[in-house]
Amino acid sequence: MLRREEQEAREFKLLSAHATKAAESKGRARPEDADLYRTSFQRDRDRIVHSKAFRRLKHKTQVFIAPFGDHYRTRLTHTLEVAQVARTVARALALNEDLVEACALGHDLGHTPFGHLGERVLTEYLGRPFVHSEQSLRVVDVLEKDGEGLNLTWEVRDGIAHHSWSRPEPSTPEGGVVRYCDRIAYLCHDVDDALRAGIIDLYELPSFSRKRLGIGYSERIATFVNDLISTSAEAGEVRLSEEVARAMDELREFMFERVYLSDEVLASQRQAQHVVESLLEYFTKHPDEITGQHRVMSDPVEIQVADYVSGMTDRYAIELYKRLFVPKGFV
């Protein structure tokens, strides 16, 4: 039998001096009794996995809205891939795998329906940037468990809040691992999905990134992961080598030009934009129809509406739009 205290002691023996130890966590906003068998970061991981927001990720778009194939990524499969890649890196660097896993599993809980399109529409609606990493933190702090939140540790909250490259760097090396692995995962699997959709051809990929990262999906992932591990171990900080970082930037620029802003993706986004805008307008006029945990009564109406609509899955948003705006005989 392996109790929590023994696991915490093992962390001090086995993990790197740079690793974040569960026993040294800065704690939770609301203090809790320790668990018999799970460390604080393990409990956070479990709370995230059992949350409603986590389950909804399976019906939220990654890039392709309502694809016909069964093998395109969703926000949930993306999250799981980030967690797997990040744990591999953390294990090799002797960092805290439990902290990495919790941050990875929670990093996209605040994502809107229809991918980043929903984020842009909510930015226009609110008149200020709607940032999914900030909303992810709001989900775990406020919206889950009917307003109680998940009461996660400071370290997991920090990793969730700072996983995006537009935000300040995370305070822990584990958060830094998730930050890199999020980008690694989405670039590699978005290329894979774009090839499957026929939007790009394999040999259209930029020549330097193709040469440096490899041609196949597995080869690209392996190159990124191995480079992140070896470079970070040598540098004493989480980062890629200059050459692989250049290949990543080149591939990301290509994906924006040829995939994320392609006619095929933008065409479906225009339809989705109308759905989100219509729902925002409707619930602004009818806030009493907002249901469940998505409503904090003390907040302004526009915040209540943003919480509600941003928490919807693609499928639920479309069905709700039909119910509200499409005559029954036309459905």
Place the predicted regions along the sequence by residue:
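Histidine-centered, transition-metal-coordinating active-site segments
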Residues: 1-79, 83-89, 95-97, 130-331
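A generic, well-ordered mixed alpha/beta core segment in the N-terminal half of proteins
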Residues: 99, 103, 108-146
